[in-house]
Amino acid sequence: NSIVRKRIEISTNENRGQLVVSSDKYSLVDNLFYNLHDYASQSKHNIIIDDGKVEKLLNLICNVLDRNVNELNDSVFLIIKDIEKECKYYVSNVLYRSVGSRKNRGREVEWSSYKYNKEFNKVLDKGIISINNEVLKFISKEREGYIERVESIAVTVKNKILELNNNIAEVLLSIKNKVIVLNKESVVAKVEEINYEVHNKFIKGNGNTNFSNRNLTEIKSILKELNKMEILDNRINKLSTKESDLLKVIKEILDSNLIIEDKQLAIEKTVVEYELTFFRHNMDTHETRNKIIHNIYPKLNKAYTELLANYKLNRYSKIKKSIHLISNKSEGTKSKEMIKLIVVLVILYIGIDKCISYSFYQIINLLTNARDGTSRTNIAINLGFRIIKVLKYIKLDENPSLNALYPINKLKDEISKLDNEGIYWIGDTLLGLITANCDIVVEELKWNSGKDSQLEVRINDKFISNLTVSGINIVQLPMLTEPRKISSDGLYFPYINSDTTNLHLFEGELIKGKYNLRDHTEASEMLYSSINYLNSIKFKINKAMLNFILAEWDNKDSKLFKGYNMLKPILETDSKEIKEEKVSSNSKYTLYSNIISLASLYKDNEFYLPVYVDFRGRVYPLSNYISYQGGDLARSLILFADTKCVLNNSGKECLNVYLANLAGYDKLPWSERLTKVDGIIKEYLESNEISNTKYIEDNIDKISEPFQFISIMYAKLLSISNPKANISNPILFDASCSGIQHIAALTLEKELASNVNLYTDSSNPKEDYPQDFYTYALEKIRDKLINSDITELRDIKLNRKIIKRSVMTIPYNISMAGIGEHLMEHFTVKTVLKYRYVVIPGSATISSKDVYLDYSKYGQLCKIIYFVLTKELPSLRLLSNYFESMIDIFVKLNIPITWVTPSGLKIKYTNIKFKPQKVKTSVLNTSKITTIKLPTDSLDVLSTKRSFMPNFIHSLDASNVHLLLNSVSYKNLPVYTVHDCFASTANNMFKLEKLVKNAFINIYFNDEGYLLKLHKHFVDTIISATDPYLSNGNIENENDIKGLTTERLEYKPLLSSNYVADRISTKADIIKIPDLPAGYKNKNKNINEFVKGILNSKYFIG
């Protein structure tokens, strides 16, 4: 019996025949179980006990004793005693039955074995019946008592109400000396009417309709079903059979009695150990994934053994020879031999088993979460960096003979000197050992362009679904303890065990650099305090939502999962297109499966989500499964923990608006969204009678985030059912076109600001429709198309959905080719009489007929859109021209482009060129010549110009978040951000909105404004690298030199005669410093208007 419960021990005192009762009922059923089996086994009658009846009897006894009712317990104890007594009787006695005849009436024969068995097991049936009868008698008696008590209470309540009504009647009669004829019945009716109105006033929030009692009953029924934990546990148990061994071990740790800190440390060590011994952990089980591993391990082990065999012979004689040869070579000629030696030493020190396990595990992880691409070069370099970190775990005494030959500290020192080519050698050797000896990881030529052909690495389609589920490492798990604070010198070790951080993060760095940037971003105190606060926010899993999701996950016809809740087997006969579709679908299955598995694991634990920062200051959670920056499914499962949020009036309003937003009404005025809520709820309740997903299925075109909609719907229903309920769901409001909001603020262009809801002078903004910049841009594009010289273009009207992606990338230097690619996501290509055409669907044309464009005319369409988006928005054009002029100067002077963000980060934007180089890692005979790209000291001018604007705008976005978190920390609000989206509990959203606005205002409109500060910084940087030049007038050309001065140039930013001379150039090149955009001519007046308009805007976020 595996039932876990409080136990009551009953032992039989055979001498006195008494039952001894203690505090453990499990021992009672244990003793009965063992006694019955002992009786049966000791019997000479071959009694076979019916285990099904025994289990039924024991479960019934446990369930009855759970009630802790003395009267019932006494009855059960006596029944148990009778059962044991009677069973023992059948075992210890020889029994007979009469077989007499007329001649021999007294003849008897002993019972058969069948008869002994039947009577013995019949005792168990009698015991079950007796206990059930006792339970029924008790329940009947208890029910009679309940009825009496309820009737008594009802009489008391009725008398109290009548007494209260009499008092109310007297008060009403005395008001203003009016004579009112009342009786008790009318007063009762009036009181009920008042109560009903008060109740409905709460329920409807800001709506204008009421809910019936049937609605309320239905709401309670929905919530009750969602909160049935036994159903949730059953679904999780079903899911757990598919989990990896790693997740099962983590579950055991989470379910243990360890303190929180020890649990976290145990999980960290378990995951790291699992990665280092991946194969050993998975060799002996029978799951499909592990059968694959079992089959390939011998091949990999043989390959490693053969590689190292020559080096191990005669006490490492070959290594000794290599060391000797290298020591006699000059620095310039020993590099390849040194790298080859390092590769061998790394494998020897780490060991074959750990090298196989860790490299295989990391390759699967890199290919599953391919942020830096899947070229062989990228995978090899990343793998090289990761395997080197494992050396930190190697102790000096682990391999004394090898350490005596080549000390590990000396090896680490040599590794620290390696460039990307050396790191590539290490990673490529390990990758080559796997690709050459198994077909799980395969290579394919991705771009076939002669010498520039590049190998891509991927998981074989046959194995991808079975292997990627295992690719979970420690940084993808939530933390049970609050992440460690960033130290005073900027070191970041969020995990309890420092080695965990070193192995998986960036050597204790908060800011993750970018491979093509020469310089690292310098952090600031504000960044540190912001990250420390964000890391301190505690979360928990939304169990009701998890219950819903698990049920939907098992539904093969789920419209919400769109088929991604089932693995699609990839067949040899599948076409390339079908295989790609299946691989993509299975990838989403793996993502969803991991999210659900981890949510199930952590459902009973509060947790934290540590973050890291990219070079621009943008914040990202380390976990990409349980993450508030994840997709719809992940965000729907997260609640704030440690928050007491009983909805107040502002909370009700924000919850209602967010529900309306998720239902697809986010383009309506704020006030109209509030009126939609009751209708949404009533329609949902009606649909729920058919299916709990029918409402979403019927409104799938409007609801883009169905899981979050369900999550917020349940929160709303809970608040209706229980006004005192704690509603800790994150309410997420996002900025509209935040990149363009930053451009409007930088340039102080009021029209643009108004079109992105940054600014409004409305007297009642809640009644206004939110501005839609996409529609604004679409109208400008349509004006150009209708006046086109090309007949086909005049029939094209496009729509908001088609141009949205292109408009979103306006602040990020959209190209004409980029626009063409974005548009093709909505168009098709057809061949007619050997000519290929782009087909514009009838839904995007005035005539409602398909329009066929040849590629020349399609190019004209793209050109018109590009012209409108880049040239007809004056502020964007002015700002782009200004930055391009500044970048030209920095490039000409060969100095890095630097800026200090409003939150104090110092960013050096130095995109460098890479040169291709052919490399063959000679450690393996099977290694191939591969072209890798190595960094140079030269700046990549084209890349810098193209990518400066998006990275600059993102750094401002990030600063807004840093300033917000800094101010939020003083108010101790629960909060998270998704770059330009902001979340808190419903009651705190208006406070958060104000703080977001204040942070934005502090960036652009306090003191002299950020663009002027940035301009001065640019000028100071330029002046420090040049000689000042003073001119008596305007310079017509570079030869018009009036004189140089050694005095520092005092730059006057609003004048147009500021020049410097390039001190490095052989000819005295004169450089004009560009002016600020035009909006700054009336800066002070514009700033005051902007601040007032921002504070007045209802849709800045929301």
UniProtKB/Swiss-Prot annotation:
What InterPro entries does the record point to?
DNA-dir_Rpol_C_phage-type (IPR046950), DNA-dir_Rpol_phage-type (IPR002092), DNA/RNA_pol_sf (IPR043502)
Any one Gene Ontology molecular-function term assigned to this protein's record: DNA-directed RNA polymerase activity
Role played: DNA-dependent RNA polymerase catalyzes the transcription of DNA into RNA using the four ribonucleoside triphosphates as substrates.
Q: Could you tell me which SUPFAM superfamilies the record lists for this protein?
A: DNA/RNA polymerases
Q: Which domain of life is it from?
A: Eukaryota
Provide the reaction this enzyme catalyses. RNA(n) + a ribonucleoside 5'-triphosphate = RNA(n+1) + diphosphate
- The annotated active site, in chain numbering, is 734, 804, 980
What keywords were assigned to this record?
DNA-directed RNA polymerase, Mitochondrion, Nucleotidyltransferase, Plasmid, Transcription, Transferase
Return the Gene3D superfamilies for the record.
Answer: 3.30.70.370, 5' to 3' exonuclease, C-terminal subdomain
Record Pfam families: RNA_pol
Organism for this UniProt entry = Agaricus bitorquis (Pavement mushroom)
Matching PROSITE patterns: RNA_POL_PHAGE_1, RNA_POL_PHAGE_2
Please state the span of the N-terminal signal peptide per the UniProt entry. none
A Gene Ontology biological process noted in the UniProt record is: mitochondrial transcription
Query: What protein name applies here?
Result: Probable DNA-directed RNA polymerase
Query: Could you tell me the EC number(s) of this protein?
Result: 2.7.7.6
Give the record's family classification. Belongs to the phage and mitochondrial RNA polymerase family.
Where is coiled-coil annotated? none
Q: Where in the cell is it found?
A: Mitochondrion
* One Gene Ontology CC term in the entry: mitochondrial DNA-directed RNA polymerase complex
